[in-house]
Swiss-Prot record:
Protein name stated in the entry: Synaptopodin 2-like protein
GO cellular component: cytoskeleton; nucleus; Z disc
Function, as annotated: Actin-associated protein that may play a role in modulating actin-based shape.
Low complexity: compositionally biased ranges: 202-214, 530-540, 571-580
Chief localisation class: cytoplasm
Species classification: Eukaryota, Metazoa, Chordata, Craniata, Vertebrata
Length: 975
């Protein structure tokens, strides 16, 4: 048994003290230091028996009493311990202990002035107040010695700085006698400083005390890495505390980084980066920075559309479309990013919307019990159902307020409060009526104040397209209206007021002929078709040019009497997810013009319905782009080829049979561009050019409408339903691809039409062809004229150039464009100053020309010579300054005339060409005689040379390079 000594250890700094106790009277064992962590720096060792705490003897204390006494001590704890040392064993000394060799050893001279050490003489070891000894832990172990086998856990490190190897320990106050004598035999290994990473066990080495100047240093310098904490017993190497943990705990601490794949690491990094960005955007250091403001603006705008998951609109204060609403610091700021700077935010993104909607739950609670929709949704539970119910109540209440403000009109015996019930149904039954006026079929807006025409409801202004309507300047093209229909047919009948399938619920007045309904809503369930005539054409003149978008009701011919057939029931209509565009046929001359009534402002609930509910995604654009690569541009129409086409055209279309003719009712983007006008066919760039723009999903762009020629009473053709495209594809009353079949002329196949032929040819990349020098139809006017153009934008006798293209947009500087024609850039406009051309010149071989500029327009290559018979129209009037403002996609409103106008072609700015034919400008300046409209059409088509506004036939000419066409802009016809 070794010698015993009493050591007094002073710990300062406050709890935790950095050691553990075991034993006590309840275990019949003395209180013993079971384990010490940072308290070892003050000289405390394991297995030290506790004799006194702060001068109070604790030999008969229980464990709990000793811990209470230790906890009661304030900033300083004085422990008196008894230490038993084994004589023969080499131990690792405490780092704070100054070792003094035994005087029996010949190699250990006594330090000068040190008295002889005696056993059981207390040693006072004091550590400084800020050392690591006070940031360990002091916890109680009542479970006895069995806990000694428990694996060690890593302790919380304090902020104190560990020492370097060889550096002195923290301050040590030595008592009068040295610490316990450790006899070291000669030749036996002695241990150096226990903080050395690799301790030396050299033979005969004696422990030297640290230098005196090292004792004056309060702290050692910083040492990276874990410091070594000695253990008690015959351990040859001092082991660090970190090395005593088990492998399981080490793996948990390391979080098994070795098992993390590269993908998980990237996902983790991306998530951290996203959270950092989100926290910077929501809890930004500078909340007025541009990025934060843009984020908040877009988030406010996105809130209106992300609520479609449960069909509720954004807050009532968020009605403005572009600006940041007053509540720009939205609920997301408070809830989602309340803990924004901590990057472990897992809050529910839907909770702010739910709280926002539940806050309005008191709005019309009693009405929800009696509503038809509430009866349906009562069997289902969930957040979406609740929010649908609240939205329906809001719609009903807003419509009631509207009914109190406006006159209490009746719509087929049903009051204004009832239709909005049909608007808040689950979106599975939502149908998308596409109308430029955006009037839902069950909208509470239209009413008949004096038995007059239905009132159009003004809606959101679509800035990209306007109908060219003479009398509808106040009406604007709107976004898509979404009409909800409940799934059950009985609820639909209740919501729609038990309308019958055949008649329109908004009946026109019986004084005049029934106008065409603007759209027909096709419902997938057993709902009746309701067409609203609220957006029917109205003008001060009999001929109108409003273009309407129709939901598929393809078989809708107009009888020669002018009265249209009733809307087709849904059994006859095509139940497709796509929609067709029908250009509305103008009424006959005997039709009484209807003046539009005063517009009723649209309630906010209708706009909320449109915003909060997703438009039915038809996939029109995606299908068109997918088909555009493999489908031919035109429908073949082979069954109609009864007459043999021109040999001139046959020579140009020889290569068209390389691609298979695609049939069916579908259409691609090439056909979309074709229906913009024959000029637009020849400049379409592949799927991303200026002529084919990507349309928005929610509100399809209204096509650039063209005033159609008044058709003669012929047998109506019913084109199959096709996807909506920016042109007049499925025209009523026999309009085939935008052109009117003339009376007495058998209708040619749709592939006839020079622009269409050349465009299809260029689409198939068959660019090796030669334009004929002379054409039989131009030299011999007695021959039958060419077949009508695929589009009504140019007369049938007009010849197209394969290099024709559209002009650039308004904000486009053509002189800086690589596509701007060189001749137009360098040569003056001499087309007006030249005299009439009599003799046609030799045609140019397009191969030589297109090798250098394959798809650019050479304006000097046009020679406007019709022959000696028509010298007048070849030189157009000089260009005059434009008075009216020219906006993109819009032309000034035509002045309403009492007489039917001659075939006027209004093409928007994006569909015109740099070389617009001169006949269009001549229309604006030459007084047009007004014969019978149908007769003028027939004579215009049958005898081109006898007509007052005959069109020149441009041809290729390699030598006449100084000619340039008259450029027509959209305001040319209305000055």
């Amino acid at each position: 048994m070794g010698a015993e000594e009493e050591v007094q250890v002073t710990l300062a700094g406050g709890a935790p003290w950095g050691f553990r106790l075991q034993g006590g009277t309840e275990q019949r064992k003395p209180l013993q230091i079971r384990r010490r962590s940072q308290a070892g720096r003050a000289g405390l060792r394991e297995r030290d028996q506790l004799l006194a705490i702060n001068g109070v003897s604790c030999t008969n204390f229980s464990h709990a009493s000793a811990m209470t006494l230790i906890d009661a001590s304030g900033r300083q704890l004085v422990l008196t311990v008894r230490r038993v040392t084994d004589e023969g064993s080499v131990r690792s000394p405490s780092p704070g202990e100054l070792q003094v060799l035994s005087p029996l050893s010949p190699l250990s001279p006594e330090p000068p002035g040190a008295p002889v050490s005696q056993a059981l003489q207390p040693t006072s070891l004091r550590s400084p107040p800020d050392s690591e000894a006070y940031y360990g832990e002091t916890d109680s172990d009542v479970d006895g010695p069995a806990t000694q086998e428990k694996p060690r856990r890593t302790r919380r490190r304090g902020p104190a700085r560990p020492s370097l190897p060889g550096a002195p320990p923290d301050e040590v106050y030595l008592s009068d006698s040295p610490a316990e004598p450790a006899p070291v035999k000669t030749g036996s290994p002695s241990q150096g400083d226990s903080r050395v990473s690799s301790p030396s066990w050299e033979e005969g080495a004696a422990l030297q005390p640290p230098p005196a100047e090292a004792l004056l240093l309060p702290h050692g310098p910083l040492r990276p890495g874990p410091h070594l904490i000695p253990m008690v017993g015959p351990v040859p190497h001092p082991v660090a505390e970190d090395l005593t943990t088990t492998y399981t705990q080490k793996a948990k601490q390391a979080k098994l980084q070795r098992a993390e794949s590269l993908q998980e690491k990237s996902v983790k990094e991306a998530r951290t980066k996203c959270r950092t960005i989100a926290s910077l955007l929501t809890a930004a250091p500078n909340p007025h920075s541009k990025g934060v403001l843009m984020f908040k603006k877009r988030r406010q705008r996105a809130k209106k559309y992300t609520l479609v998951s449960f069909g509720a609109a954004a807050g009532t204060g968020t009605e403005e479309e572009d600006g940041i609403p007053p509540t720009s610091e939205s609920e997301l700021d408070e809830e989602t990013f309340s803990d924004a700077r901590s990057l472990t935010n897992q809050s529910d993104w839907d909770s702010p919307y739910l709280d926002m909607e539940l806050a309005r739950a008191g709005l019309g609670t009693a009405e929800s019990q009696n509503s038809g929709l509430g009866g349906q949704l009562s069997e289902v539970s969930g957040r979406g159902v609740q929010l649908f119910e609240q939205q329906r109540q809001r719609v009903a209440s807003s419509s009631q307020e509207l009914a109190q403000v406006g006159p209490a009109a009746m719509l087929n015996g049903q009051s204004l409060q009832s239709p909005p019930r049909a608007q808040s149904a689950p979106p599975e039954a939502a149908v998308l009526p596409l109308s430029p006026l955006s009037v839902p079929a069950v909208s509470p807006t239209p009413f008949f104040p004096d038995g007059g025409a239905p009132i159009p409801a003004p809606s959101i202004f679509n800035r990209s397209a306007r109908p060219f309507t003479p009398g509808l300047q106040g009406q604007r093209s709107g976004t898509t209206s979404v009409i909800f229909r409940p799934l059950a047919p009985k609820k639909v009948n209740e919501g729609l007021g038990s309308t019958s399938p055949a008649p329109s619920p908004f009946a026109a007045p019986p004084q005049g002929p029934t106008p065409l309904p603007s759209f027909t809503t096709v419902v997938p369930s057993h709902t009746p078709v309701s067409g609203a005539s609220s957006s029917t054409q109205r003008s001060s003149g009999p001929v109108t040019a409003t273009s309407s978008l129709y939901i598929p009701a393809p078989s809708r011919p107009v009888t020669p009497g002018g009265a249209p057939e009733p809307p087709t029931p849904p059994s006859a209509a095509a139940m497709t997810s796509t929609a067709s565009i029908f250009l509305s046929t103008p009424l006959r001359n005997s039709a009484r013009p209807e003046a539009p009534g005063p517009a009723v402002p649209e309630p906010a609930s209708v706009r909320e319905q449109r915003i909060s509910v997703p438009a039915a995604r038809t996939g029109i654009l995606q299908e068109a782009r997918r088909r555009g690569t493999r489908k031919q541009m035109f429908r073949p129409g082979k069954e109609e080829t009864k007459n043999s086409p021109n040999p001139e055209l046959l020579s140009l279309v020889q290569n068209l049979d390389e691609k298979p003719r695609a049939g069916g009712a579908e259409s691609g983007p090439e056909e979309d561009a074709l229906s913009l006008g024959a000029e637009a066919c020849n400049f379409m760039q592949p799927l991303g050019g200026r002529s084919y723009k990507t349309l928005p999903q929610v509100s399809p762009k209204t096509p650039p409408p063209m005033a159609p020629k008044t058709p003669p009473p012929t047998t109506p053709k019913t084109p199959p339903p096709v996807a909506p495209k920016p042109g007049s594809r499925g025209l009523l009353d026999g309009l085939v691809n935008g052109s009117t079949p003339m009376v007495g002329i058998p209708e040619p196949p749709r592939l006839q039409g020079r622009g269409g032929e050349l465009f299809a040819k260029r689409q198939s990349r068959a660019d090796r062809y030669v334009v004929e020098a002379t054409s039989g139809s131009s030299l011999n006017p007695g021959l039958r004229p060419r077949s009508p153009s695929p589009t009504p934008s140019l007369p049938p006798s007009w010849k197209y150039s394969p290099n024709i293209r559209a002009p650039p947009p308004i904000a486009y500087n053509p002189l800086l464009s690589p596509f701007f024609p060189q001749a137009a850039r360098t040569l003056p406009n001499k087309a007006q100053s030249q005299g009439p051309r009599v003799t046609p010149k030799q045609g140019i071989k397009a191969l030589d020309f297109m090798r250098h500029q394959p798809y650019q327009l050479k304006t000097a290559m046009f020679c406007f010579d019709e022959g000696s018979s028509t010298p007048g129209p070849t030189s157009g009037p000089p260009k005059t300054a434009r008075v009216q403002e020219i906006r993109r996609f819009s032309t000034p409103a035509p002045q309403p005339t009492a007489e039917p106008l001659a075939p006027t072609v209004l093409v928007p700015r994006a569909a015109t060409t740099l070389d617009e034919p001169i006949w269009r400008a001549e229309l604006a300046s030459t007084p047009v005689p007004n014969p019978d409209h149908q007769e003028s059409l027939r004579s215009f088509a049958a005898a081109p040379s006898s007509c007052g506004f005959q069109v020149a036939r441009p041809r290729f000419s390699a030598t006449r390079t100084g000619l340039q066409a008259h450029v027509w802009r959209p305001g040319a016809g209305h000055q």
